[in-house]
Amino acid sequence: DIQSGFIANVGLNIFNQYVLESLDESIESIKPVIKPDIKLDCFWGSSIPKSYVDADSERIDIYKRLEHTHHSKVDEVKDEIIDRFGELPEVSNNLFITAKIRSVLSEKNILRCKIRESQIELFPVDLTEEVNLRIKTLDKKFIFRNKRLVLNFKDVLTPDSVYGILNSSL
């Protein structure tokens, strides 16, 4: 039998190669993105109190949305929640900032972060020349040893200031 059309023009082997490459691309595009489990220990509370959102299922949905939201889009989710449930209690506002921090940490492949009132400890960190220069512009002292970066500050940190530091320095 004589082949015609596209297969005849390119040959069966090349056609099979096109099909396999196309399948590889399709499979790659549907693979779930697995985010690493980030250990974040901070000194502020962050939650959605039952007094703010009564239904457990709605609170869980908000937590899930925040878990999968890029830090640049967290404020959009926050605005939706405020529109629906009213002004956020401080502990819930902290939750949205904490979600931004988690997203930045995930983006930078930092698996552990401990935040104290005047200190941020990160691990692991690859201290590139660019990151090193940005860190030196901050008003603080830092220690870098064994892929662990410890930033010490004079002033007490706020959730917003921690997010700003991590987003701009790493």
Predicted features along the sequence, with ranges:
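Accessory helical-bundle/CTD segments and flexible terminal tails appended to RecA-like ATPase motors
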Residues: 1-170
